[in-house]
């Protein structure tokens, strides 16, 4: 793929991970910006399989195959998400923020690193 595209590995091959992969593909429909390279999953039984045309790898395998890839966290359970954050951060890897182009937001909204905001979301400041 083009060197201008940002490689993204989606951590989590379950429901939210697959939804996140679709969200990233939907972002690309508006402006081709990302290259989805794989799913990362801790379930070793999934390693080597293909889901929605993407290979499923372990974290170390993914980093070896795609050392420049940013991570998008597609893990829905809060405790598991914290564990993923710690594991990825401990390896010195970075999370990508994904904001769909059809998000409406105030210019005063601050979005943190690794945030995922889906299409149709409206963000505003309330008092």
Where are each of the predicted segments found?
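A structural motif detector for beta-strand N-caps
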Residues: 97, 103, 109, 113-121, ...
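Short active-site oxyanion
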Residues: 7-9, 35-37, 68-71
